[in-house]
């Protein structure tokens, strides 16, 4: 691509009130360093768990770190799609997004090292066929497609896959599980801080995905059907991952019930439809400064806090 101008030099400068740059500024303001998290108490807490509990938690952590690594590797075509569309603000935000995914990979690996889980953990994913289909097939295929087809429809498919199903259902459900483990048992303070920090980052990631789908739906109503179809394809796969995880254990640790996590994941997925649908027929200029995607993620976080405070 030949460069002909610099958008940062345009009259009026950059629109700092636009959603992507609002998220970019928020990420800068909330910067954190994994090395600052104290994992020193987590080793003793980890060893106080039963073998069954450690096995379950290791599988949960393996899914997280492998997922963070996958997105670190797969997200680049979305940046190129933003460049092809001439959206500097989105491109700036996605550079931060990619950095944060790499940082999340780092911090989960640091935690595993701190609690002594240094063996090969790949086996913890071998018995999770839905997880492997999502991360080994659906995610890379939908993002790599943007390298040759950066169209709005392809962007909506990619965002629905990652931001709405993987982050917006699977990851949120996993964070909820970590909160239940840590808060109910009053253990693993380092993991609690790790999840709090990552959750804050990923609320911005999900908000960007919602914003991206909303602006494409506002521009062309046909993209609503693209979003709806992709979500309906993948939601059953996301819920199946919960089935796969619970099916591996005759005895379920931590007092967990499969139905609780299925309901949690389904609720988060279904509520995303309304936020995207509300953009239909809207003016693009309105969508660009509409912060409802971020407000939705903050609402989810506040709801979780209330539930966990009740169970503590």
From Swiss-Prot:
Binding site for Fe cation: 101, 167, 202, 205
Cross-link named 3-(O4'-tyrosyl)-valine (Val-Tyr), sites: 71-162
Name of the featured protein: R2-like ligand binding oxidase
Keyword rRNA-binding included in the entry's annotation: no
Keyword annotations from UniProtKB, A to Z: Iron, Manganese, Metal-binding, Oxidoreductase
Cofactors, names only: Fe cation; Mn(2+)
Highest taxon listed in the record's lineage: Bacteria
Alphabetical GO biological process terms: deoxyribonucleotide biosynthetic process
One Pfam family here: Ribonuc_red_sm
Cofactor note: Binds 1 Fe cation per subunit. Binds 1 manganese ion per subunit. The iron and manganese ions form a dinuclear manganese-iron cluster.
EC number(s) on file: 1.-.-.-
Species, as recorded: Mycobacterium sp. (strain JLS)
């Amino acid at each position: 691509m030949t460069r002909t101008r610099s958008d940062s030099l345009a009259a009026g400068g950059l629109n700092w009130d636009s959603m992507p740059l609002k998220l970019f500024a928020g990420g800068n303001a909330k910067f954190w360093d994994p090395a600052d998290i104290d994992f020193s108490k987590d080793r003793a807490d980890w060893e106080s768990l039963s073998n069954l509990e450690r096995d379950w938690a290791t599988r949960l952590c393996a899914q997280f770190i492998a997922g963070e690594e996958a997105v670190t590797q797969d997200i680049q075509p979305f940046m190129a799609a933003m460049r092809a569309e001439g959206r500097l603000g989105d491109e700036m935000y996605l550079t931060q997004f990619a950095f944060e995914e790499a940082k999340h990979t780092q911090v989960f690996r640091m935690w595993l090292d701190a609690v002594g889980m240094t063996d090969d953990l790949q086996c913890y994913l071998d018995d999770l066929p839905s997880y492997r289909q999502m991360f080994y097939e659906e995610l890379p295929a939908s993002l790599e497609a943007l390298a040759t087809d950066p169209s709005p429809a392809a962007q909506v498919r990619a965002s629905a896959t990652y931001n709405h199903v993987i982050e917006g259902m699977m990851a949120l459900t996993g964070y909820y599980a970590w909160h239940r483990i840590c808060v109910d048992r009053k253990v693993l303070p380092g993991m609690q801080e790790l999840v709090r920090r990552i959750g804050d980052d990923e609320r911005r990631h999900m908000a960007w995905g919602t914003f991206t789908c909303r602006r494409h739906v506002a521009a062309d109503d046909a993209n609503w059907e693209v979003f709806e179809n992709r979500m309906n394809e993948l939601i059953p796969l996301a819920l199946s991952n919960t089935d796969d995880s619970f099916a591996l254990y005759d005895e379920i640790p931590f007092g967990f019930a499969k139905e609780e996590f299925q309901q949690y994941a389904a609720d988060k997925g279904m509520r995303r439809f309304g936020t995207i649908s509300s953009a239909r027929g809207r003016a693009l200029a309105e969508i660009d400064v509409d912060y409802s995607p971020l407000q939705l993620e903050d609402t989810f976080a506040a709801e979780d806090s209330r539930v966990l405070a009740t169970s503590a």
